[in-house]
């Protein structure tokens, strides 16, 4: 039987302690009853001085739907084109049946025929638990498999292999890294990566993990609206308050900032991490499926390939309706039943689409109002409204923003590229290339711990400028308690259980004493990335315990290291595959050129030498027939050998032709002399 004191020793709840007071056992209850609220606080804020970074710092917008990379060139940020010539890259990763990994547009193109192994919008899963309500909603809407990982997080599965959302993000980041390296002409190691402003600590940590897995040194994680504000305000001299309305592919953020002589100070931020273009696509998809069933009695939800075609058509129609008042959705041979093939032909007007997504647009209103309230500004105080994210191209969204803020939004920044540009500018600041900019961001959600009765006691309130550090002294909740469990939460609800549990740790070795006597100082330290560090110290013994908060799931150090190795292995496989393809292209080109020249100069070439060369070509073709099992180096060597042999033969032909020309020329001269 566990004694009362031993049972009490495992109580996880702390009692907020008043101070400084004599250590009288009965006094603790007095404080708990609320007769004194002078909670001992030691709060301090510090600036993080970063040393100048060597080499280029790339800025990456790791988006839900599309990603973008930029670098500083002098005082200007430049958005880079990928290998397909596009300035944005779809955040899509696919695994083919033979194990090849595709990223970006090649992955998106084959989604219809490979829906179960093509991952998109996985940013919405990053840092989330499998049991989260948002994840449950996503499971119903996506064709790929979302599974529970051993740590309770939401992961995805392809061909029987499990991948964390951080890994999928890392594959996209590797593509961004490669794009930057192709432009710069040298390796790119350092990066600034953006996250939605309303991301919690788990999601920020998981994004940083993605950077690490991709081989990047993530110098800073900054908020997307803040990055967009940097892109907007870098060359602006006037002081003003601006609002950044960021409705992207998967998330919505609203931030209120004050720009003053190069200082960008975030006054407040709000948002919804599960609201974006993907939801607009899904709403239209459901409408189309419903209409198709009404007209044909065929339920498309049972056909993943047909659904993927409808999903792509929905995205295309959504984009077209931003510039047209009506669009046609035509999908021939979408499915079939006993009566034959079924085609989808539908006209969709802009007003119809606006009706379908009206509730989604309406969901952006309350966060905007809350952000203004928290920043203590009215709409008349806001000098400019910046639109960020592809969904802000929708006229109805622009009208909603105008109604909200009482002014037409600015078109000063490219909504697809502003965030990456801002990230590159912040990279320039860290590298010492941009010196006249200071960024003061905020933490989006309140942070605190669970205390007696399951109450959420806040140490750092939302919209506090970061980096910041705050401390508060607590005490034990039971007599003889020798250890306390610190549960760290993030959110705005009064009860700890209603907020996000970021992590927990235990401080042990507290000398037994009556409840309320020990003094336990809990310190929260938020770094410039918005990532939380927590420590607890028994002031009596000096014993301390500290952690960098990871979610109660999250990736362990070993898991991250394994994923880094896997990413490197994939990079090596990609390099070998590319090397092989280039060698095959070279070989096929040499075969084509050789055969063309042999036909052209057949009269000048010795028959036996021609036959030898034909044998070489036949051997080369045999090698190419088994190209999938050959190395690029072997194919290249064989191709080079064939090229050398053909050059020797054609050299003989040229010499023969030259001597024939000379002899015909000299015989002509002799004829002239005789005349």
From Swiss-Prot:
Family as reported in the entry's similarity comment: Belongs to the heat shock protein 70 family.
Full protein name: Stress-70 protein, mitochondrial
Subcellular location: Mitochondrion; Nucleus, Nucleolus; Cytoplasm
Swiss-Prot/TrEMBL GO biological process terms: chaperone cofactor-dependent protein refolding; erythrocyte differentiation; iron-sulfur cluster assembly; negative regulation of erythrocyte differentiation; negative regulation of hematopoietic stem cell differentiation; negative regulation of hemopoiesis; protein refolding; regulation of erythrocyte differentiation
Chain intervals for the UniProt region annotation (Substrate-binding domain (SBD)): 444-675
Span list, region Nucleotide-binding domain (NBD): 65-433
PROSITE patterns on file: HSP70_1, HSP70_2, HSP70_3
Annotated keywords: ATP-binding, Chaperone, Cytoplasm, Hydrolase, Mitochondrion, Nucleotide-binding, Nucleus, Transit peptide
GO terms, molecular function: ATP binding; ATP hydrolysis activity; ATP-dependent protein folding chaperone; heat shock protein binding; protein folding chaperone; unfolded protein binding
Positions bound to ADP: 65-66, 315, 318, 322, 390, 393
Region (Interdomain linker): 434-443
Catalytic activity annotation: ATP + H2O = ADP + phosphate + H(+)
Keyword Cell division in annotation: no
Binding partners and assembly: Interacts strongly with the intermediate form of FXN and weakly with its mature form. Associates with the mitochondrial contact site and cristae organizing system (MICOS) complex (also known as MINOS or MitOS complex). Component of the TIM23 mitochondrial inner membrane pre-sequence translocase complex.
Activity modulation notes: The chaperone activity is regulated by ATP-induced allosteric coupling of the nucleotide-binding (NBD) and substrate-binding (SBD) domains. ATP binding in the NBD leads to a conformational change in the NBD, which is transferred through the interdomain linker (IDL) to the substrate-binding domain (SBD). This elicits a reduced substrate affinity and a faster substrate exchange rate. Upon hydrolysis of ATP to ADP, the protein undergoes a conformational change that increases its affinity for substrate proteins.
Pfam families assigned to the protein according to its UniProt record, in alphabetical order: HSP70
InterPro entries, alphabetized: ATPase_NBD (IPR043129), Chaperone_DnaK (IPR012725), Heat_shock_70_CS (IPR018181), HSP70_C_sf (IPR029048), HSP70_peptide-bd_sf (IPR029047), Hsp_70_fam (IPR013126)
GO cellular component: cytoplasm; mitochondrion; nucleolus
Role noted for this protein: Mitochondrial chaperone that plays a key role in mitochondrial protein import, folding, and assembly. Plays an essential role in the protein quality control system, the correct folding of proteins, the re-folding of misfolded proteins, and the targeting of proteins for subsequent degradation. These processes are achieved through cycles of ATP binding, ATP hydrolysis, and ADP release, mediated by co-chaperones. In mitochondria, it associates with the TIM (translocase of the inner membrane) protein complex to assist in the import and folding of mitochondrial proteins.
UniProt EC number: 3.6.4.10
């Amino acid at each position: 039987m566990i004694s009362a004191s031993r049972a009490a020793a495992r109580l996880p709840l702390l009692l907020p302690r008043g101070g400084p007071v004599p250590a009288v056992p009965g006094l603790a209850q007095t404080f708990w009853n609320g007769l004194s609220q002078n909670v001992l606080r030691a709060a301090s804020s510090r600036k993080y001085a970063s040393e100048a970074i060597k080499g280029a710092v790339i800025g990456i917008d790791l988006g839900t739907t599309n990603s973008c990379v930029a670098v500083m060139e002098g005082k200007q940020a430049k958005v880079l084109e990928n290998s397909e010539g596009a300035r944005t890259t779809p955040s899509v990763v696919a695994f083919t049946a033979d194990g090849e990994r595709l990223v970006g547009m090649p992955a998106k193109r084959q989604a219809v025929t490979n829906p179960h192994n093509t991952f998109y919008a996985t940013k919405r899963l990053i840092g989330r638990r499998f049991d989260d309500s948002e994840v449950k909603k996503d499971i119903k809407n996506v064709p790929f498999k979302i599974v529970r990982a051993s740590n309770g997080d939401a992961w995805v599965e392809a061909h029987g292999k499990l991948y964390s959302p951080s890994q999928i993000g890392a594959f996209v980041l590797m593509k961004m890294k490669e794009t930057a390296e192709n432009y710069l002409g040298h390796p790119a190691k350092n990066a600034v990566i953006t996250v939605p402003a309303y991301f919690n600590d788990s999601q920020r940590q998981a994004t940083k993990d993605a950077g690490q897995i991709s081989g990047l040194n993530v110098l800073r994680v900054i908020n997307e609206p803040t990055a967009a504000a940097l892109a907007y305000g870098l060359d602006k001299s006037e002081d003003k308050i601006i609002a950044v309305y960021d409705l992207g592919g998967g998330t919505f953020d609203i931030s209120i900032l004050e720009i003053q002589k190069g200082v960008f100070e975030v006054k407040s931020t709000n948002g919804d991490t599960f609201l974006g273009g993907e939801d607009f696509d899904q709403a239209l998809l459901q409408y189309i499926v419903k209409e198709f069933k009404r007209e044909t009695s065929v339920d498309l939800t049972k056909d993943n390939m047909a659904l993927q075609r409808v999903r792509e058509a929905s995205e295309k129609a959504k984009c077209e309706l931003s510039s047209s008042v009506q669009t046609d959705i035509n999908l021939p041979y979408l499915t079939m039943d006993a009566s034959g093939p079924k085609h989808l032909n539908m006209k969709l007007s802009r007003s119809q689409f606006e009706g379908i997504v009206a509730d989604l647009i309406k969901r952006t209103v309350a966060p905007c109002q809350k952000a203004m309230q928290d920043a203590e500004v009215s709409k008349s105080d806001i000098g400019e409204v910046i639109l960020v994210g592809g969904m802000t191209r929708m006229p109805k969204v622009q009208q909603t923003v105008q109604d909200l803020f009482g002014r037409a939004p600015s078109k000063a920044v490219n909504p697809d590229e502003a965030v990456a540009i801002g990230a590159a500018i912040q990279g320039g600041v860290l590298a010492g290339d941009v010196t006249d900019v200071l960024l003061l961001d905020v933490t989006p959600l309140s942070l605190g711990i669970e205390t007696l009765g399951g109450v959420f006691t806040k140490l750092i309130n939302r919209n506090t400028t970061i980096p910041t550090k705050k401390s508060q002294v607590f005490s034990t909740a039971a007599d003889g308690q020798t250890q306390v469990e610190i549960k760290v939460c993030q959110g705005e609800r009064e009860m700890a259980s209603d907020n996000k549990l970021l992590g927990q740790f235990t401080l042990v070795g507290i000398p037994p004493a009556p409840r309320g006597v020990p003094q336990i100082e809990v310190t929260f330290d938020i770094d410039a990335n918005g990532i939380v560090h927590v420590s607890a110290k028994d002031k009596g013994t000096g014993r301390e315990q500290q952690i960098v908060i990871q979610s109660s799931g999250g990736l362990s150090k070993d898991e991250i290291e394994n994923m880094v190795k896997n990413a490197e292995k994939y990079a090596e496989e990609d390099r070998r595959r590319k090397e092989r393809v280039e060698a095959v292209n070279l070989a096929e080109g040499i075969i084509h050129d050789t055969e063309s020249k042999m036909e052209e100069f057949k009269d000048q070439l010795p028959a036996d030498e021609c036959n030898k060369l034909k044998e070489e070509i036949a051997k080369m073709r045999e090698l190419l027939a088994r190209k999938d099992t050959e190395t690029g180096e072997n194919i290249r060597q064989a191709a080079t050998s064939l090229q050398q042999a053909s050059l020797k033969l054609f050299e003989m032909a040229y010499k023969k032709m030259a001597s024939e020309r000379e002899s015909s020329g000299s015989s002509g001269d002799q004829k002239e002399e005789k005349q």
